[in-house]
Structure formats: C-alpha cells, structure tokens
Swiss-Prot record:
Subunit architecture: Part of the 30S ribosomal subunit. Forms a tight heterodimer with protein bS6.
Stated family: Belongs to the bacterial ribosomal protein bS18 family.
HAMAP family: Ribosomal_bS18
UniProt source species: Clostridium perfringens (strain 13 / Type A)
Protein name: Small ribosomal subunit protein bS18
Recorded name of the encoding gene: rpsR
C-alpha cells in the first residue's frame, strides 16, 4: 500500500475490497453488460486489479466475461 502525504502527515491508503467477494458471487455473467461496463475504460480497455479492486480469482473471471461479451458483440472492442 502506498503512503499518502496529507497535511504534513502520512496516511496509509485503504485497501480496496473485492465487490464480487462481498456479494459472494459464484461466477460473473458475460450477459450482464451494465456490470461489465464498470470495469472498462472509455477507450475499451479492461481495468487492472489495482484500480478496480477485485481479487485475482474474480479478475480472471471478469476478463473472461468481458472478452466473451466482446466476441458476441455485446461490448465494443474499442470506441471512437
């Protein structure tokens, strides 16, 4: 974790908690486009773990779901 200097004092940044672990999600559905769009940048790239806050297991499932939904044209590969 990175230390953040704020007002002359160093404060430790809070660790992000995986949203899918909190919800006890078994798997991530590739057809749930609204949820998948939260983990894609405006350029169409998949957000990394350190930004999205997901755990390694759910990041892999998220990546597979995004790639699968791109292949069946539910999500765009890139944006203009």
């Amino acid at each position: 974790m990175s230390n953040v200097k704020r007002g002359g004092k160093f404060r430790r940044a809070r660790k992000k908690v995986c949203i899918f672990c909190v919800d006890k999600a078994e798997s991530i559905d590739y057809k749930d486009v609204a949820k998948l769009k939260k983990y894609i940048t405006e350029r169409g790239k998949i957000l990394p773990r350190r930004i999205s806050g997901t755990c390694a297991k759910h990041q892999r499932q998220l990546t597979d779901a995004i790639k699968r939904s791109r292949n069946i044209a539910l999500l765009p590969f890139t944006t203009e």
